[in-house]
From Swiss-Prot:
Pfam families: IPPT. The keyword DNA-binding does not apply. Gene3D superfamilies: 1.10.20.140, P-loop containing nucleotide triphosphate hydrolases. This is tRNA dimethylallyltransferase. One of its GO terms (biological process) is tRNA modification. Its EC number is 2.5.1.75. Monomer. Substrate binds at T12, A13, V14, G15, K16, T17.
Amino acid sequence: MKQKILVLGGPTAVGKTELSIKLAEKLNGEIISADSMQIYKNMDIGSAKVTKEEMRDINHHMIDIVSPEEEFSVADFKNIGEKAIKEIIAKEKLPMIVGGTGLYINSLTCNVTFTESEKDDEYRTYLESLAEANGNNYVHEMLKEIDEISYRDIHPNNRKRVIRALEVFKISGKPFSSYNVGDDFYKTDYDVFYYVLTMDREKLYNRINKRVDIMIENGLIDECIELKKLGYTSSMQSMQGIGYKEILYYLDKKISLDEAVNLIKQGSRNYAKRQLTWFRRDPRCTFLDKDVLSDEEILSKIIDDITNN
């Protein structure tokens, strides 16, 4: 009998955190955060990081594990996350993967191959120089001709991954996206119960806008000032996160605060749209509409599925 794993995904601001903690309490679970921003130390407000109070003594993994100046790949997440899963299982608890970063979720629940071994340092340096001279969008557009799926899935500001996708195509002649497809892709050692929270788009967008306002009220600007004092700059992977790069532009007097806030809201809404597109392509996902089901009904369904299957 395969070990069960619960996955709770969904777009930003849909309400994953509170529900996941209730589930962990009911199912004797521990949570592995699948969020590409919550991995960073000292970046709490802009990442909507779960607080100690919100955790309610539920163990959380993959939060505050790297400093903002460090590079961190999906392969890194997979290596550390797999160890966390084994630790949770050893305690006879249920591993629960919770978050909105689909690549992170797949790295732990799919038969994912990382093409990290072959490299072309000269070509990579060339692409880096192109991005420096012309901006991230320039190299991102280069993807469009050779790998539509990666072009759609990888954000222009994720320069490292864009460059890796271009590099893989140059080395192998195969699109980066083609390395993780096929009949065996969803085969794992685990019995994966995968749920995605959704709600009406306008309602979700309103929640996103409100959350951004609360982040500003709670001190996002001060958080970014402190990060700048520590020497962290907009060229770092971590500081390209939505909420951070816009406030850094404001602090550098490139845009007004109102412009920064509006850009954060727009960027967050666009991100939520991309997240939903990602989840809809995954045949394992069971979608739970929060406009149709109450939180209690969602809890009951998931608990019933896990305990009776």
